Amino acid sequence: MRSTSSLTIKWVKPDITAEQWEFDRHPDKQEFYLRHNITWEQILSGIDAGRLVPYPRSERINGIPVALSYSSYDDYARYLAKAKRGYRRNYSLMEDALQRQGALTLPAPIILQCNGEALLFSGYRRLCLAWNYGMVPYVWLVPLG
């Protein structure tokens, strides 16, 4: 799937194994996993049931609230201000590449959906890059439970 403005991002299915840190160590996401009894094995086995769906800048996807999406620009600015230097630097490198090349192919951010709730599992920088350039990004929406 493609999102376009004057620049272009092509979204592809992400490699879930590259995102295990988000499950094992991200402190803000642990409560969601515990509340829904989500295991890493469930995520691994459910990833292929996911699909690319558009995600306009919003706190909801398909009417379902998305935890940790920080979808407003003000939320993004606050998040980035608190982020470590390496986090901001990686965003800047991605932004520079988009401006220089005019097009990027990126793994889609991952959203886990479970029991009427959703969680932005990974890919916030990629999501923000698209949103900040007026694009509608695509995410890999994974139904669990």
Model-derived regions: residue spans:
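N-terminal extension/subdomain marker
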Residues: M1-D48
